[in-house]
Amino acid sequence: MSDQTFDAPVWHHGKALRKGYTTGSCATAAAKVAALMVMRQHLIHQVSIVTPSGVTLCLNVESPHVEGQQAVAAIRKDGGDDVDATHGMLIFARVTLNDSGEISLLGGEGIGTVTRKGIGLPTGSPAINRTPRHTIETAVREAIGPSRGAQVEIFAPEGVLRAQKTYNARLGILGGISIIGTTGIVTPMSEESWKRSLSLELEIKRAAGLDRVVLVPGNHGERFVREQMGIDPQVVVTMSNFVGYMIEEAVRLGFRQIVLIGHPGKLIKIAAGIFHTHSHIADARMETLVAHLALLGAPLPLLTLVSECDTTEAAMEHIDAWGYQRLYNHLAERICQRVLEMLRFTQHPPACDAVLFSFDNQVLGSSRPLAAIARELTC
């Protein structure tokens, strides 16, 4: 049985919704139990892991097999009541011990391969995102000890078929699914319920006396604020895709400064007046980049290159190569302008700032000097 945090349902309109776990948790658990089996030389039918969010999962093991220096195990993906394309499929891990002292991670059958730049993984590598890579390697290292080496292969026999129901091909991930998950847990929640829970966090912070708030899309933004800006996480609230809603809630509650911090892939949509940033509502990332590059006098070849990109990261590589890094300060200023336009009928609109950062936590641009923004947030 998993811990109470996981077992507790999410309630929505009087209905209890069951949580699930990510493909990253499945791969981590499968790799851990395979490593344990090859060390102990017997089958194991249940395994527990601690997810990045601190939740303990106790999962049933399927198809366990051990022979000599190699073991294989599978975990069945369970998305809870948030069913997606990978729900119910088996995620396998094959662990082979060696004397290298290193842990190598491979993507096997049904795991997609990265074929384009722009998603934070090297071209040609398996589509296993950073957090699952870390949790897999950590779990295997704990199982085999500090000196042994191991080759870990993650595979999913249904992956090719299941991937056809995802956006992987559009992102240049071919041949299978992605192993993903920053928290390890899938939490089902309707949009309205989700928005209300985010707003509640704003209310709690305002009640505690805070009148300045940092709004971030998700975990990456929170980490950037803490590690790169040295700002107390107490002032940070996740806005997810609900930018306009959370800004309006911050105004309603009387916050006098709002700072939007995030990756351009999300925040540049605000520069186009898009205040719900989920892709099913609107995209316009490349169009926004092209328009503002043109305003800065960028040449047509660069505009063409950017317009043909599928991801913001890919476009950013072209922007950097052509020396148009000043675009990011321009976009940050434009984001603030758009926010103030949205609040033009507000009697006492808050001050607004924006900060853009890259996937490797480097500051790209800001509406004002970053030091001044950080200093005000720590007052």
UniProtKB/Swiss-Prot annotation:
It catalyses: Co-precorrin-5B + S-adenosyl-L-methionine = Co-precorrin-6A + S-adenosyl-L-homocysteine. The keyword Magnesium does not apply. Its EC number is 2.1.1.195. SUPFAM superfamilies: CbiD-like. GO terms for biological process: anaerobic cobalamin biosynthetic process; methylation. HAMAP family: CbiD (MF_00787). Belongs to the CbiD family. This is Cobalt-precorrin-5B C(1)-methyltransferase. It comes from Klebsiella pneumoniae (strain 342).
